[in-house]
Amino acid sequence: RPEEIGAGDQGHMFG
């Protein structure tokens, strides 16, 4: 999911 692409970096859409 696009919002989990940067899960290790706060997330792409998590902040």
Swiss-Prot record:
Keywords: ATP-binding, Cobalt, Cytoplasm, Magnesium, Metal-binding, Nucleotide-binding, One-carbon metabolism, Potassium, Transferase. Homotetramer. It is found in: Cytoplasm. Catalyzes the formation of S-adenosylmethionine from methionine and ATP. The reaction comprises two steps that are both catalyzed by the same enzyme: formation of S-adenosylmethionine (AdoMet) and triphosphate, and subsequent hydrolysis of the triphosphate. GO terms for biological process: one-carbon metabolic process; S-adenosylmethionine biosynthetic process. Its cofactor is Mn(2+); Mg(2+); Co(2+); K(+). Pathway: Amino-acid biosynthesis; S-adenosyl-L-methionine biosynthesis; S-adenosyl-L-methionine from L-methionine: step 1/1. Belongs to the AdoMet synthase family. On the 2D-gel the determined pI of this unknown protein is: 5.9, its MW is: 43.3 kDa. It comes from Zea mays. GO terms for cellular component: cytoplasm. It catalyses: L-methionine + ATP + H2O = S-adenosyl-L-methionine + phosphate + diphosphate. It is an enzyme of class 2 (transferase). Its EC number is 2.5.1.6. Binds 2 divalent ions per subunit. The metal ions interact primarily with the substrate. Can utilize magnesium, manganese or cobalt (in vitro). Binds 1 potassium ion per subunit. The potassium ion interacts primarily with the substrate. One of its GO terms (molecular function) is ATP binding. This is Probable S-adenosylmethionine synthase. Coiled coil: none annotated.
